[in-house]
């Protein structure tokens, strides 16, 4: 793990000329400011100021100065940039001018949730993501179309699968940036792909997910394609999910964790599915809308996968999509899980039916559904005392 001195030495020895200081708005959109390498020591010591009124969800113009503080443990070379005059990236924490943490810094929000789980509950959470995306062709002006790069389907191979070389480049780039992909394959939709990650701590997993989306877009653009992470880019094809796998250090608390997340599912939805298009995806093509859980059941909100010895506490949240802010979603999932653990909550019985085909009977069984529009999800979240306490704003 790099220290400040390690990074300063690395920058000098490796001919690094530019340092990108990255952070995120409340939607999870990555922002950055690029500084010259000679300014890095000052950035570590004093921070770098920016106009928070220009960032979505942050501050108003009358009091808008905030400071970025690079986290040396997140330094990574950008492999697609030149080898002479190299470029590195670090994620940042955000503070007010007096040094107090900024409450809407989503990386700090997640770090605080991790700290509470560790110090108050003796729990460590680990996250793994499965991120789906489409590759579309560009038109003669270089603008994205809705024409898929190929017409392959689930786990097809070349020549039907035209995305394997791009996935290969993406995986190589991830490894060069210190991220370990586990598997990649073609997904169900034409031009749709998926790459899965090795489990890691919550903050690293969120950093990796955001880095992944950046790499995919960059590598796709280099290949003359457009990478689309939206939840339902083609109305009659499979949507793209952001499946979240969670495990805890004490496997005996899995049921409590599961129950806590189910309890708060409606409140979480606005943050896991934060665009109008998100709600076109839910309810079909393995994107559940019923608040239930099942063993190996992909039609439920939470799936408990077939387990091996090293992931006995793992659960999978199947509804989120890639438009979400992973820092905020992971934060809320941790607090929901802790609520279940603290109050020793127990989940309802697991569902064995296919809820995509048995949905009408599910309502009569008392299985609730997620909000079906962005407006209804927003209203539920705005009224939630759980959300207010977890996020603090």
Regions found by a protein language model. Name each.
Residues 1-393:
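Glycine-rich, acidic/polar active-site loops that bind/position phosphate-bearing ligands
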């Amino acid at each position: 793990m790099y220290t400040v001195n390690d990074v300063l030495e690395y920058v000098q020895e490796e001919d690094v000329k530019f340092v990108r200081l990255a952070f995120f708005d409340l939607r999870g959109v990555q922002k950055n400011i690029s500084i010259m390498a000679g300014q890095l020591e000052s950035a570590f010591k004093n921070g770098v100021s920016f106009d928070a009124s220009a960032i979505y969800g942050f501050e108003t113009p009358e009091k808008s100065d905030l400071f970025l503080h690079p986290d040396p443990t997140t330094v990574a070379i950008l492999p697609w940039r030149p080898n002479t005059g190299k470029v590195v990236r670090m994620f940042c924490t955000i503070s007010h001018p007096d040094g107090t943490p900024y409450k809407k810094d989503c990386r700090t929000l997640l770090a605080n949730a991790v700290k509470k789980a560790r110090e108050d509950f003796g729990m460590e959470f680990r996250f793994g993501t499965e991120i789906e995306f489409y590759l579309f062709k560009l038109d003669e002006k270089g603008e994205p179309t809705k024409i898929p790069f190929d017409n392959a389907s689930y786990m097809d191979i070349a020549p039907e699968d035209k995305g394997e070389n791009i996935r290969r480049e993406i995986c190589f780039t991830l490894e060069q940036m210190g991220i370990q992909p586990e598997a990649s394959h073609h997904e169900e939709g034409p031009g749709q792909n998926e790459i899965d990650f090795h489990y890691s701590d919550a903050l690293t997993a969120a950093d990796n997910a955001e880095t992944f989306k950046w790499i995919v877009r960059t590598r796709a653009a280099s290949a003359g394609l457009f990478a689309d992470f939206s939840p339902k880019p083609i109305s009659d094809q499979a949507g793209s999910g952001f499946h979240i796998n969670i495990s805890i250090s004490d496997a005996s608390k899995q049921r409590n964790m599961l129950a806590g997340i189910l309890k708060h599912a409606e409140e979480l939805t606005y943050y896991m599915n934060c665009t109008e298009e998100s709600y076109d995806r839910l309810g079909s093509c393995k994107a559940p809308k019923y608040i239930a859980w099942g063993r190996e059941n992909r039609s439920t909100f939470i799936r408990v996968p077939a387990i091996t010895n090293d992931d006995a506490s793992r659960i999978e949240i199947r509804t989120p999509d890639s438009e979400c802010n992973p820092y905020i979603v992971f934060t809320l999932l941790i607090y929901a899980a802790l609520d279940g653990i603290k109050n020793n909550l127990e989940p309802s019985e697991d569902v064995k039916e296919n809820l995509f085909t048995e949905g009408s009977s599910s309502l009569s069984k008392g299985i609730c559904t997620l909000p079906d529009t962005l407006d209804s999800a927003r209203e539920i979240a705005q009224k939630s005392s759980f959300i207010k306490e977890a996020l603090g704003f």
